[in-house]
Amino acid sequence: MDKKYLVLNIEQEYRSDLENLPWDTPLIEWNDKQVKFLDIRKGISKHTVRFIKTKNFAFAIKQTNPISAYFESETFAKLLQKGIHTLIPAGYVFYKNNLFEKNAEEKESLAFIVTILEAKSIPHSILFKWDFSDTSRKTIYKAAAELLANLHFNNIFWGDASLSNILIKFIKSQDDRGKSRTELKAFLSDSETIQILKTISDDHIKKDIRCFNDSMIAINKDFPKDDKSKSDIDLNEDKKYFKQEYKNHFELLNKIAEFEKTTGLEIQKHFFKITDQYSIDSILKQIEEHKWYLSEQSGSEIDITFAANEWIENIYKPIIKEFNKLKIFDYFINTNSVKLYTDIMAHKYYLSIERGEDIGIYSAIRSYSEKHSDKEESLLSKFVEKLLKRLTKIIPPNYNL
């Protein structure tokens, strides 16, 4: 390979692993004497894609055209900056005979985009083949709906929204106690058609959703119907489910943004993760009540951002501390203090709507405990009374929480 015809735009940490690969040869012609291939299942792609292992890293390499290689690499980087789940680009490579000659033939050029191989990521099509159950499909559709909602919330038009263009990855996260949990997330794996807009239009949103629905129809046709679990699929129900999950997540993202703008509080910093927009409504209502309380105490109007910080420090954090002291995990399994608090707030919100009046935090805790704890009634009753007694020391008299 004559390196004077090589353009290697690769991140420095990966450069030594990639610079001596056979970039002057079409990817389909690479052989195991030149590189170490990884035997990894891959999804449907219109481009040649190979997975390789170098001394220090594992990569996915896709052969494409020069413009697409550059555009995709830059787009992946921009998506990551916006917090979108997508591939991590290592860079792109061009190889062209007579690179600097004015009349060089375009067909003599080769272009590649290189991304870091995602550990524990699986193409949707493989997961469907393993398990085409209702639960499996809906888990994937929910992850894909959240990905699409995140894109649209950030004014990004996908252009080719499709099951074929996502990877499903199992990722680990930690709660406030450091307890690990595994979540399934969808990662955008092809950014060739991505457009980052100033404002995304309704037409763009509808087009992406329609395109994704078409891919659901296509994947349904791709699988044989001899399996009863596959023949009983209600595609219309699947589409409704996807649309509803998209709507829920898009509304949640807007609700979070509105809450953070109003209160100056960061959801992730204080509450780790909220998946229910009604929890946010309930928390905002508490902050507004705290604002009213502080204004009454001071005799003048208190700013809501000041009230929000006061509420965090003097109401919310002390309550979370009491939850931890009382070992609430013994009574509510698979939870943590922050999640329990937001779940109780959502429960309070629903019950208040149902009864047509604010039921208050004490009634909400009693009701939630009876509904969601598997402890026997006498033990649970003692726990709840002990908790409520401690909360009265935190919450001021005549304070509506």
Where are these regions (language model features)?
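Short glycine-biased active-site loop of nucleotidyltransferases that positions the nucleotide triphosphate
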Residues: 99-107, 176-181, 203
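C-lobe/activation-segment region of protein kinase-like
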Residues: 180-257
